[in-house]
C-alpha cells in the first residue's frame, strides 16, 4: 500500500515591473549566504608619490583594493596586529573593527590600519605613517 504525502502550498509572491531608479546597486552574497547591497566609496590616498583616488567597495579592505589597482602601500601582518600599514584619516569614516594594534585613543585621533579598514563613507587617508604613529 502506497502512502501519499501532501505538501503545503508554496506561499504566493508578487512583484512589480516599475522602473528602477537610475542608481546602480551591486548585490553580493556574504559569508552568511544572505544577499546584501554593496556600496562603493571614493577613497583618496595621499602617498609620498602623490595622491590617488579609488572607488572601493564597502566589503574590501583598502590595502587589498589598492594592491589590486597596482598601488604599492606598506604592510606586514595583514591582520591588523602591527603598525606597518598605518595611515592617518584626514576626513571620512571607516570600519577597522578587525584590528587589534591601535588603542581607542589612537583610533579616536584618526589612526588607521589600511590592511583591515573598510570604507564606510568617502575618505581621505595619508599613508606611510608608521614612523609618525610609533614616535
Curated annotation (Swiss-Prot):
Kindly list the GO CC terms recorded for this protein: chloroplast stroma
Q: Which domain of life is it from?
A: Eukaryota
Where does the record place the 2Fe-2S ferredoxin-type domain? Answer: 41-131
Binding positions ([2Fe-2S] cluster): 77, 82, 85, 115
Q: Which UniProt keywords apply?
A: 2Fe-2S, Chloroplast, Electron transport, Iron, Iron-sulfur, Metal-binding, Plastid, Transit peptide, Transport
- Subcellular location as annotated: Plastid, Chloroplast
Keyword Chloroplast listed: yes
Q: Which family does it belong to?
A: Belongs to the 2Fe2S plant-type ferredoxin family.
Name of this protein: Ferredoxin-5, chloroplastic
UniProt source species: Zea mays
Q: What is the lineage of its organism?
A: Eukaryota, Viridiplantae, Streptophyta, Embryophyta, Tracheophyta
